[in-house]
């Protein structure tokens, strides 16, 4: 963030979606390393606000995480 002396405010950088920035075409539920970036330590899915993903990719991400949970690739709850 840059400090603007005229108005004494911060200029915010534009948030960019991880998936559009890296030109991902499809989120695969078998890609556990990618999915774990968007899950908390307790196993919950992180929100769009935290991950800076667009609505389209957040929906696909949630579906992929839920499929991976049902296929027992990711635990439902981590203790």
From Swiss-Prot:
Domain of life, source organism: Bacteria
A Gene Ontology BP annotation from the UniProt entry: translation
RNA-binding listed as a keyword: yes
Pfam families (alphabetical): Ribosomal_S18
Gene Ontology cellular component terms for the protein in this record: cytosolic small ribosomal subunit
Keyword RNA-binding: yes
Keywords: Ribonucleoprotein, Ribosomal protein, RNA-binding, rRNA-binding
Family annotation (HAMAP family): Ribosomal_bS18 (MF_00270)
Functional description taken from the UniProt entry: Binds as a heterodimer with protein bS6 to the central domain of the 16S rRNA, where it helps stabilize the platform of the 30S subunit.
Record's protein name: Small ribosomal subunit protein bS18
